[in-house]
Amino acid sequence: GYPVNDGFCCIKGLSLDKQQTVVKTSPLPKIRQADGSMKEVSWDEGFQYVADQLQELQAKYGRESVAGISTGQLTMEGFAIFGHVMRNYLKTNVDGNTRLCMATAVVAHKQSYGFDAPGYTLKDLELSDTIIFIGANPVVAHPILWKRVRQNPDKKVIVIDPRKSETAMNADYWYPVKCRGDLYLLYTLANVLIEKGWIDQNYIEAHTEGYGEFKEFVKPFTLDQAQETAGLSPEQILELAQLIHEGKRVSFWWTMGVNQGYEAVRTAQAIINLALMTGNIGRPGTGANSITGQCNAMGSRSYSNTAVLYAGGDFTNPARRAKVAEALGVDESVLAEKPTATYNQIIEGINEGRIKGLWILCTNPRHSWTNNETFASAVKKLELFVVQDIYDTIESAEECT
C-alpha cells in the first residue's frame, strides 16, 4: 500500500460529508470593496491585485512590512512555492501555525541531534515490540497511525498520560502520571536505568556526548520523590523501567500532551535521552518519535514556511547556507542572514505598525491564535490582509481585504 496510510482511509476524512464541512465557497477570489462588500473577480485580476499591493507596501514601508503565516496542511509542492515566494522573491518574514504545536519538538530535535528531523517512519510501529505513548492519544487523533499499531502482532503498548484516554483503554499498561509530573518521571526513569545498568554503554560511547554530566544531573530524581511529584509508586516506575530494559525494539512516541505541556522542550529532550541511553534509536522499530498534529507540519519546516532556513536549518550556519543555496540554484546572498520573525512577532509587528500587509494560508488565527483578541485588534491595522482558504466562512476571512 501507499507508504503513509498503507491503503487505510482515516475515519475523519471518510466522515467529512456527514459534517458541516461541505465547501460552498465560490471558486473565484473576492476583493473587498469600499462599501465593505466582497466582489468576485477573475483569478488573473485577483493575482494581479495581491501582487501589486504587496509590492506597493514594500516600496512604501520597506521589505519587512509584509509577512506570511503558513500552515501544516499543504503538499510539499505547495510549501515549496510559498516558501520561495516569501523568502526568495519578497524576501520577507514567514512563519507557520505549526509553531503552536511543533516548536517544542523542533527545538528538542535541534538541541539533541543538531537538526530538525525525527528519524522514523510509520512502519516502525509495526516493528516495535515495546511502544510507549507519552501525552498522545492516537486512537482518536491519529487513526491511521493506530492502525499500524494494531497490525503489529508482537507488541506491548504502554501509555503515560494523566487521563485514561481511548489509547490508554486499549493499552497493556497505563501509567497515570500527575499533570506537570512527566518530566520528573522521565528523569527518574533515566536514573533507575543507569543505576541498574540497563543502558547501552557501547551506543552511548559511540554516538552521544555529555553522558557523564547527564548521569550526575539525574541522580537527585529518586523513586520516593517521584511518587509525590509524578504520582506513580516506586513499583510502577520500576515496572516501567524493566519494560524498557526488556524490550528489544523500544519506540517512544509523543505529541501535543508533551509539546504544549509544562517545560515541554525539556520533556521532549528527556524522551530522546531515554532512547539514546538504551540504544533504541537508528534501528527499525525504535526511536524517540514526535508525532505531528497536522498532516505535513514537517513540510512547512523543510521549505522555510517557518522562521527557519530550508530543511529546518539556521540562517547563521555557513555550511547549511551554502548547501541550501546550491540546492535552490540561487546566490547565497538571496537567503536571509538572520532568524526571521516568528508567528507571535508578526502579530506584534502588526499591532506596533511595522507590518502593513499579511498573507495567511490555510489557517485561521482569528480563531486559533493563543490570545485571539490580539489578532483581532491587529488585523484592523492592516492595509492588506489576504486569506487563502477553501472556506470563506472562517473568522479570519471575514476580516480580509
Located regions from the model:
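Flexible, glycine/charged-enriched surface loops at secondary-structure junctions
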Residues: 61-65, 199-204, 251, 282-289
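Conserved short loop/turn motifs at secondary-structure junctions
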Residues: 67-75, 228-232, 255-262, 294, ...
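Short, conserved loop/helix-junction motifs that constitute active-site signature segments
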Residues: 149-154, 278, 376-381, 398
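P-loop NTPase catalytic nucleotide-binding module
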Residues: 180, 184-250
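Long hydrophobic segments that form regular secondary structure
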Residues: 236, 244, 342-360, 364-368, ...
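A glycine-rich, hydrophobic/aromatic-adjacent loop/helix-cap motif
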Residues: 244-348
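Phosphate/diphosphate-binding loops
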Residues: 374-375, 380-394
